[in-house]
């Protein structure tokens, strides 16, 4: 079964997309064709969107789901004429909140993603630059500045997690790959030992790691299942021996990995 889902907004569409994805994830047996349409900020764009929704309805034989965060009443009225199942995200939540708080909302476009704290913005940009500069064990001499150091096998998700932590939380995260040479020594790499309290380990199912590595270096020893099994087994033994907290990332998205790291380590979002 397939349904089309539109995520529409007069801003970036990030809020509609995030909440819509979270809701649709609860329906695992249904395949969704996801379409994000940002910046529907005038009536002409709204009418064009109505045509797209109606066309999708004709093709699918089912009306599309339409998640929207449109704040302009006139534009919303036009879109409501489309042959779609409308999910008014702001209306659903703001109306009860207005009643509870006895106050009218501002209905401002893009409010949730506005840069209203210059210090927080600068902190996040600095954290992103730190993650890039200290990726893959490149500059271990800067580890004293890190809030967190992710370690793990090559291709276990360290880099995207560091960047997400930087962008979303302002966390200065470095990462260090545990290599076969490190495992042969059967002890923690010397560059990491002074910063043990900042370490957090990532692990992954060997089968999944082999699949990921095969995309990079197909049919190599590096990507073989046997090699991946050996590395993961030894790395997990090191985590346990050194009492380093760690997480199996196989079933988690970058967002989920990052949130679990924040909870486990007790790190706080920089605002």
Swiss-Prot record:
Catalysed reactions listed for this entry: [pyruvate, water dikinase] + ADP = [pyruvate, water dikinase]-phosphate + AMP + H(+); [pyruvate, water dikinase]-phosphate + phosphate + H(+) = [pyruvate, water dikinase] + diphosphate
InterPro entries the UniProt entry points to: Kinase-pyrophosphorylase, PSRP
One matching Pfam family: Kinase-PPPase
Residues of the signal peptide: none
Coiled coil ranges: none
Keywords: Kinase, Nucleotide-binding, Serine/threonine-protein kinase, Transferase
UniProt: ADP binding residues: 152-159
Record flagged with keyword Protein transport: no
E.C. code: 2.7.11.33, 2.7.4.28
GO molecular function: ADP binding; ATP binding; phosphotransferase activity, phosphate group as acceptor; protein serine/threonine kinase activity
Family assignment from sequence similarity: Belongs to the pyruvate, phosphate/water dikinase regulatory protein family. PSRP subfamily.
Function: Bifunctional serine/threonine kinase and phosphorylase involved in the regulation of the phosphoenolpyruvate synthase (PEPS) by catalyzing its phosphorylation/dephosphorylation.
PANTHER family: PYRUVATE, PHOSPHATE DIKINASE REGULATORY PROTEIN 1, CHLOROPLASTIC
The protein's name in its UniProt record: Putative phosphoenolpyruvate synthase regulatory protein
Taxonomic source organism: Marinobacter nauticus (strain ATCC 700491 / DSM 11845 / VT8)
